[in-house]
A protein has these predicted regions:
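Intrinsically disordered, low-complexity regulatory segments in ankyrin-centric signaling systems
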Residues: 1-41, 138-140
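Conserved ankyrin/ankyrin-like repeat signature
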Residues: 34, 66-67, 99-100, 129-133
Length: 140
């Protein structure tokens, strides 16, 4: 068996790529029940795509608060930055996803993580309600 065969690497295995794509789509679409089954089967909550986006980033950016909460419950790193230095909280602030911002904040996401951070994005876009939320200690 040659170790030079790229198809022997799980990253290049077409079945693994297809499964990962499906899981990322579940997060992007907010299909929490189906995603929960994969998480229960051992898929890591911090699964990351080729842009550095975690499942949490995809769910947050697309406004799926229940999916974000599910990922929080499964131990997702809420401050993990993508390849552009963005956090899930900053993505939710940028998109104006109030429910997602609240879930992430309540679970302890750092409003100062990343560049621009969620706090910086809130200031840039005049979202004072987020700045007020970030000033309060997280409710755990």
């Amino acid at each position: 068996v040659s170790t030079d065969d790229p198809t022997s690497d799980p990253v290049h295995d077409p079945e693994v790529v297809t499964l990962a794509t499906k899981i990322f789509q579940l997060a992007r679409r907010g299909e929490s029940e189906a995603l929960a089954a994969y998480l229960a089967a051992g898929v890591p909550a911090d699964l990351t795509n080729d842009n550095g986006d975690t499942l949490t980033m995809l769910a947050a950016y697309h406004g799926h608060a229940a999916t974000v909460a599910l990922l929080c419950e499964h131990g997702a790193d809420l401050d993990r930055l993508n390849d552009r230095g963005q956090s899930p909280l900053a993505g939710a602030v940028f998109k104006g996803e109030d429910a997602v911002v609240r879930v992430l904040t309540e679970h302890g996401a750092d409003p100062h993580a990343g560049a621009p951070s969620a706090a910086e994005a809130a200031r840039m876009f005049g979202k004072d309600q987020y700045l007020d939320l970030f000033a309060d200690p997280p409710q755990r």
